[in-house]
Amino acid sequence: MNLSKLKFGSTIGIIGGGQLGKMMAQSAQQMGYKVIVLDPNSSCPCQYVANEFINAAYDDQIALDRLGALSDVITYEFENISANQLQALASKYNIPQGYQAIQLLQDRLTEKQTLQDSGSNIAPFLQLTDYDDLVKAVDSIGYPFIVKTRFGGYDGKGQVLVKDATHLDEARQLIQAQECVAEQYLNLSKEVSLTVTIGTNNQITYFPLQENEHQNQILFKTIVPARVQDNKEQEARNEVNKIIKAIHFIGTFTVEFFIDQQNQLYVNEIAPRPHNSGHYSIEACEYSQFDTHIKAITGQQLPQQVTLLKPAIMMNLLGRDLDLLEDQFAEHPEWHVHIYGKNERKFNRKMGHLTVLTNDINETEQKLLKQFEGR
């Protein structure tokens, strides 16, 4: 795909008004574009920065057509919009990202099958339609393994870790609700991710490899550059190069990886949009993941590479972290704090993030962990 550059003053439509949509909008407006956002939540974070806001459900075809008619280009902040509706929208309006990636990645089974067919290194998996398949997973994959719903689920939702036979009943209940996928549980040494942007002229921009730590299946912190062997970044790029031959991408997306105790790299999953682990790039790189996303979908030239200006640590701020830390923000000028503007503070809800640039990652990490003690 090779589209002409979208002129400044043109309008970018965003489906989804959460924090990702908000940060996309801010990058777009900085480049001189207007932004119109569609979201069912009348007080979503993006509502406060959008030039125009459409308060409607994601499956409201009249509202989607209005968004399309008012926009010169359309993007989305998340992958849970109906692929069929996105396909219908793409047939009438300019959606450089298309619908194919969403169609593949909404279903964990087709995601795994596509990755397998691409030659990517992934953990063994099995489709689960009933309890008999669960028994087969015990035989073919062996304990421990993870059962995940095929559709939906994020931040650890829709998953059961099956360590032994005592967890089979919990997994059976998940399968009764919807079809699932079982995948081998890996003994991990690290989790990393690679954020990538692809332009409409097939340019590829890689961000630095990101080291991630999760707590209760929610991203806790990201450290850049990742503290791994030097060859791991190139290995990750090689895996991404396999993936982009199999899946159509325009804009920013992120591939999450596991590194096991034998130092083997495995593709875990793909997010076809800007990702939580890339938020550090707002301060730590000359272009953020949102900047390159907007450049890509508007037909602009992408940088050949994104340079890390300084090592960085990004910490997510959940509702409980704001309860603990909000009085500390004014005392730490080195903290770049982003509060998303969600109207309801919940214990485990992502309410914001903070980024610290540092020449000593280990020392800064320890200082931050002390601040987050008791969370």
UniProtKB/Swiss-Prot annotation:
GO MF annotation: an example: phosphoribosylaminoimidazole carboxylase activity
Top-level class of the enzyme under EC nomenclature: ligase
One of the record's GO cellular component terms: cytosol
Domain ATP-grasp, chain residue ranges per copy: 112-298
InterPro entries per record: ATP-grasp, ATP-grasp_carboxylate-amine, ATP_grasp_subdomain_1, PreATP-grasp_dom_sf, PurK, PurK_C, PurT/PurK_preATP-grasp, Rudment_hybrid_motif
Keywords: ATP-binding, Ligase, Nucleotide-binding, Purine biosynthesis
HAMAP family attached to this UniProt entry: PurK
NCBIfam families reported for this sequence: PRK06019.1-1, PRK06019.1-2, PRK06019.1-5, purK
Subunit structure: Homodimer.
PANTHER family xrefs: PHOSPHORIBOSYLAMINOIMIDAZOLE CARBOXYLASE (PTHR11609:SF5), PURINE BIOSYNTHESIS PROTEIN 6/7, PUR6/7 (PTHR11609)
Function: Catalyzes the ATP-dependent conversion of 5-aminoimidazole ribonucleotide (AIR) and HCO(3)(-) to N5-carboxyaminoimidazole ribonucleotide (N5-CAIR).
Name of the protein in question: N5-carboxyaminoimidazole ribonucleotide synthase
Organism of origin: Staphylococcus saprophyticus subsp. saprophyticus (strain ATCC 15305 / DSM 20229 / NCIMB 8711 / NCTC 7292 / S-41)
Gene behind the chain: purK
